[in-house]
Curated annotation (Swiss-Prot):
Free-text function comment from the UniProt entry: Catalyzes the attachment of proline to tRNA(Pro) in a two-step reaction: proline is first activated by ATP to form Pro-AMP and then transferred to the acceptor end of tRNA(Pro). As ProRS can inadvertently accommodate and process non-cognate amino acids such as alanine and cysteine, to avoid such errors it has two additional distinct editing activities against alanine. One activity is designated as 'pretransfer' editing and involves the tRNA(Pro)-independent hydrolysis of activated Ala-AMP.
HAMAP family tied to this protein: Pro_tRNA_synth_type1 (MF_01569)
Disulfide bonds: none
Domain topic, free-text comment: Consists of three domains: the N-terminal catalytic domain, the editing domain and the C-terminal anticodon-binding domain.
Assigned keywords, A-Z: Aminoacyl-tRNA synthetase, ATP-binding, Cytoplasm, Ligase, Nucleotide-binding, Protein biosynthesis
Protein name: Proline--tRNA ligase
Localization annotation: Cytoplasm
EC nos: 6.1.1.15
Lineage: Bacteria, Bacillati, Bacillota, Bacilli, Bacillales
GO biological process per UniProt: prolyl-tRNA aminoacylation
Similarity-based family: Belongs to the class-II aminoacyl-tRNA synthetase family. ProS type 1 subfamily.
Protein biosynthesis as UniProt keyword: yes
SUPFAM superfamilies xrefs: Class II aaRS ABD-related, Class II aaRS and biotin synthetases, YbaK/ProRS associated domain
Keyword Cytoplasm: yes
Length: 565
C-alpha cells in the first residue's frame, strides 16, 4: 500500500486525555480516533492489526472444533427476561425501545441469543457437543470509559459458546479452549498468565481469566513466587495458618470509652494495640437482606467472596443511613458483641483464633476490649472472606504470594445449566428424557488485545509490533521522492517485494527524511528499508525496529537477507 493513498494521521504531541501508553501511541501513530467517549474509529492500520488477530483466533477456533456464525447485535428484551439478567445486569446494559414500544438491548454478550437459537434447532443428544463462535461488536455503557480501547463502550470481541450432554464433554471442550486461548495469546506476542477467576454476571462456576501483564491493568493478579499458581485477587484463597483460641487465655469482656475514635488505625492507636488485634465489622446489603462481615483489622473484606458465600445477585457496602437504621449506631462503632439487630454474622477464618480483641460496642464512642469470638460472638459461619495479601502462603502450599497488575484479554467459563434451565434449552437423552444442555462460554477481547500488545511492545519512539500482528511486514521509505535514483529504486523494490509475498507499506510521500523516520518508528513495523543516498549503487539500509540494528544491503541480496532475519 502506498502511504500517500492510505489514511495514517500521525501526531507529534501526546493527546491530553490519553492516560495509558497504548492509548497515546495508537492515537499518535494514526491507528485510532475517538468518535465520542468510549467509542473509537479503527483507522486502516488498526483494522489490519485486528484482521491479523482475528485470523489467529479463527485458526485456533477451527482447531478446537468451533464453527463461526454471526448473531444480531440488537437483542429483544424477552430473552434477557427469560434468563433473569434483564433485571440484574445493571446500568451497563444499553437498553432501548423501537417505534412500537418493544424493548431491546445492544448486546454486551450473547448467551441469551445463542441459547435461544440452539434450543430451537438441537433436540437430540446426537447433535451434541456443539461449539459456535462469532467475532462481533459489543456494547457496554461504562460509567467512566478510560484507557482508550481498554475500557470502552463499544468493543470487538470473539465469543464462543458450547453445548453438551455431560460434564465430561464440557470439560473436554473447556480444556481445548484453554489451550486455544494460550496459543492465541502466545502467537500475538503477549506476556500473559491464565488465572483462577470469578464468573461475575456471567454465572456458572469454574472460570479462568487470561491476563496480559501490565502496570496499566485494572486487575490484580496474586501469584506464587515458586509455583504456577495464579488467581485474580478476588478469587485467591487466603490460607489460614493460625491456632485455635485457648479459653484459658480469655479475659473478662469490658466496655471502654473511645470518643470520636472510628477507624481501625485510630482505635489501635488510642488503645495502644496492633490493628491485627482489632475486629473489623462491616455491614453489607446482599440483595434485600443485610449481613455483618468480620475480619481482622489489618485485613480487607473481599466482597466477591461475600457475594459467593451468601448467593446474592448484588452485594454492596451498606450506606451510613442503612447502618444507622439496621444497627442503630455510626459505622465506626459497629461490632458483633451483644448485637441486637437480626442479621447473620459471617467471619473470616482469622477471626476465629483471635484472643482478647477489640470490637465496636454498637454505641457511639464505645468499644469492647477482651472480645473473644469463640465466647462472645454468635457467628453463622467461619470461612475465607478476606483479600489475600502479598507475603501470604500460596494456596497450593508452594511459595509465597506476590502481586502483579494485569489486563484481562480473555476468559473461559463453565456455565453449567445456568442459562439452559432458565430458558428451557433441553435435548432428549438416550432414554428419551428431556435434559438441560450443559454450557460453556469463551471470550476474547479483540480490540482490548490490540491495546494490550501495544502496552507491552513499545519504546520512547513508538510502537514495536510483533511480526504476527503487524499491519504490514515492511516499511519501505524513499527518503527523497524528488531524487530520481531513490524514487526509481523504491518503486522497483515495492513491486519486487510485493511479488515475493511481502505486505509492504511504501512511504512515497513528499516529506522530509526526518518526518518519514519519525513516523516509521511511531508506527512500528518490524523492518524498515530506506532508499537513500546510496540508491545509485543499489544499496539500501535495512533497520529492525525491535533491536534497532541496521545493515547496508545490496538490492540483489535484499530478499534473502530479509527472509533469513
Amino acid at each position: 500500500m502506498r502511504q500517500s493513498l492510505t489514511f495514517i494521521p500521525t501526531l507529534r504531541e501526546v493527546p491530553a486525555d490519553a492516560e495509558a501508553k497504548s492509548h497515546q501511541l495508537l492515537v499518535r501513530a494514526g491507528f485510532i480516533r475517538q468518535n465520542t467517549s468510549g467509542i473509537y474509529h479503527y483507522l486502516p492500520l488498526a483494522h489490519k492489526v485486528i484482521q491479523h488477530i482475528q485470523s489467529i483466533v479463527r485458526k485456533e477456533m477451527e482447531k478446537a472444533g468451533a464453527a463461526e456464525l454471526l448473531m444480531p447485535v440488537l437483542q429483544q428484551a424477552e430473552m434477557w427476561q427469560e434468563s433473569g439478567r434483564w433485571y440484574t445486569y445493571g446500568p451497563e446494559l444499553m437498553r432501548m425501545k423501537d417505534r412500537h414500544g418493544r424493548e431491546f438491548a445492544l448486546g454486551p454478550t450473547h448467551e441469551e441469543v445463542i441459547t435461544s437459537l440452539v434450543r430451537s434447532e438441537v433436540k437430540s443428544y446426537k447433535k451434541l457437543p456443539l461449539t459456535l463462535y462469532q467475532i462481533q461488536s459489543k456494547f457496554r455503557d461504562e460509567q467512566r470509559p478510560r484507557f482508550g480501547l481498554l475500557r470502552g463502550r463499544e468493543f470487538i470481541m470473539k465469543d464462543a459458546y458450547s453445548f453438551h450432554s455431560s460434564p465430561e464433554s464440557l470439560d473436554d471442550t473447556y480444556n481445548k479452549m484453554f489451550t486455544a486461548y494460550s496459543n492465541v495469546f502466545s502467537k500475538v506476542g503477549l506476556n500473559f498468565r491464565p488465572v483462577i477467576a470469578d464468573s461475575g454476571a456471567m454465572g456458572g462456576k469454574d472460570t479462568h481469566e487470561f491476563m496480559a501483564l501490565s502496570e496499566v491493568g485494572e486487575d490484580t493478579i496474586a501469584y506464587s513466587d515458586t509455583s504456577s499458581y495464579a488467581a485474580n485477587i478476588e478469587m485467591a484463597e487466603a490460607v489460614y495458618q493460625g491456632e485455635e483460641a485457648n479459653p484459658a487465655d480469655f479475659k473478662e469482656l469490658e466496655k471502654v470509652h473511645t470518643p470520636q475514635v472510628k477507624t481501625i488505625q485510630d482505635i489501635a492507636g488510642f488503645l495502644d494495640v496492633d490493628p491485627s488485634l482489632c475486629i473489623k465489622s462491616v455491614l453489607f446489603k446482599a440483595d434485600d437482606a443485610y449481613v455483618l462481615i468480620l475480619t481482622r483489622g489489618d485485613h480487607e473484606v473481599n466482597d466477591v467472596k461475600v457475594k459467593n458465600l451468601v448467593g446474592a445477585q448484588l452485594v454492596e457496602l451498606a450506606t451510613r443511613e442503612e447502618v444507622l437504621e439496621v444497627i442503630g449506631t455510626e459505622p465506626g462503632f459497629v461490632g458483633p458483641v451483644k448485637l441486637e439487630a437480626e442479621v447473620d454474622i459471617y467471619a473470616d477464618l482469622t477471626v476465629k483464633g483471635m484472643t482478647n480483641a477489640v470490637a465496636g460496642a454498637n454505641e457511639a464512642d464505645y468499644h469492647y476490649v477482651n472480645v473473644n469470638p469463640a465466647r462472645d460472638v454468635s457467628v453463622k459461619e467461619f470461612t475465607d472472606l478476606r483479600f489475600i495479601q502479598e507475603g501470604d502462603v500460596s494456596p497450593d502450599g508452594e511459595g509465597t504470594i506476590q502481586f502483579a497488575k494485569g489486563i484481562e484479554v480473555g476468559q473461559v467459563f463453565k456455565l453449567g445449566t445456568r442459562y439452559s434451565e432458565s430458558m428451557d434449552a433441553t435435548y432428549l437423552d438416550e432414554n428419551g428424557r428431556a435434559q438441560p444442555m450443559i454450557m460453556g462460554c469463551y471470550g476474547i477481547g479483540i480490540s482490548r488485545t490490540l491495546s494490550a500488545i501495544v502496552e507491552q511492545h513499545h519504546d520512547e519512539k513508538g510502537i514495536i509490533w510483533p511480526e504476527a500482528v503487524a499491519p504490514y511486514d515492511l516499511h519501505l521509505l524513499a527518503l527523497n521522492m524528488k531524487n530520481d535514483a531513490q524514487k526509481e529504486l523504491a518503486e522497483t523494490l515495492y513491486e519486487r517485494l510485493e511479488n515475493e509475498g511481502f505486505d509492504v507499506l511504501f512511504d512515497d510521500r513528499q516529506e522530509r527524511a526526518g518526518v518519514k523516520f519519525a513516523d516509521s518508528d511511531l508506527i512500528g513495523l518490524p523492518i524498515r528499508i530506506s532508499c537513500g543516498k546510496r540508491s545509485e549503487e543499489g544499496i539500501v539500509e535495512v533497520k529492525f525496529r525491535k533491536s534497532g540494528e541496521s545493515h547496508e544491503v545490496s538490492v540483489d541480496e535484499l530478499i534473502s537477507f530479509i527472509r533469513q532475519a
